[in-house]
Amino acid sequence: MGTARFLSAVLLLSVPLMVTFPALLSAEYHDGRVDICSLPSDSGDCLRFFEMWYFDGTTCTKFVYGGYGGNDNRFPTEKACMKRCAKA
């Protein structure tokens, strides 16, 4: 019984890594750091409804954020998104 609980806990705790790791593989890196503007949109893990903005590689696009999790390609306004991600 203890082993089954342990394995269930390990599996449950590894789910966020299974979701996050592929996104990091597809991201671009600059000076060893992830370029957040190259990350895909990620609505997160919760079911709340926040209108946010992400950079899609060309422009800033609105998406729904659930309120928890996700990645850093998430901005409260289009202006903040463009300021951080748009290339001059």
Curated annotation (Swiss-Prot):
One of its GO terms (biological process) is envenomation resulting in negative regulation of voltage-gated potassium channel activity in another organism. One of its GO terms (cellular component) is extracellular region. InterPro entries: Kunitz_BPTI, Kunitz_BPTI_sf, Serpin_venom_toxin. The record marks L47, R48 as: Reactive bond for chymotrypsin. The keyword Disulfide bond applies. CDD domains: Kunitz_huwentoxin. The record marks L39 as: May bind Kv1. The lineage of its organism: Eukaryota, Metazoa, Ecdysozoa, Arthropoda, Chelicerata. This is Kunitz-type U15-theraphotoxin-Hs1a. Serine protease inhibitor that inhibits trypsin at a molar ratio of 1:1. GO terms for molecular function: potassium channel regulator activity; serine-type endopeptidase inhibitor activity; toxin activity. Disulfide bonds join C37-C85, C60-C81. Residues 1-27 form the signal peptide. It comes from Cyriopagopus schmidti. The keyword Heme does not apply. It comes from the Eukaryota. Residues 28-33 form a propeptide.
